[in-house]
Amino acid sequence: MLTEKQIKFYKENGYLLVENALPSKILKGLQDVTDEFVEASRNVAENDETYDLSDDHSKENPRLRRLKQPHLLHKTYEDVTLDECILGPVSQLLGNNLRRDHTK
């Protein structure tokens, strides 16, 4: 959980960096799933409903700029948005009335 000093910093500056906010197991899961999407993007030549590709993307050198709505593409992304390691600090800063509209 956040300290009073962190909450004060957020209120004064509008942002907060929380070191090691994600447990290593969750971070590793996100990295593995993202690597799978990067690998799959080798077979995609242009932006589509899933992939936003970099201009220099190629089959030989896949360059994935972002996944569109990742929480709908894989349960790992969905799960992290609902995990207490994210929701706990966010609710401390913004309150409990939270809603996810979309993701990038």
Predicted feature residues:
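Non-heme Fe(II)-dependent double-stranded beta-helix
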Residues: 1-12, 19-104
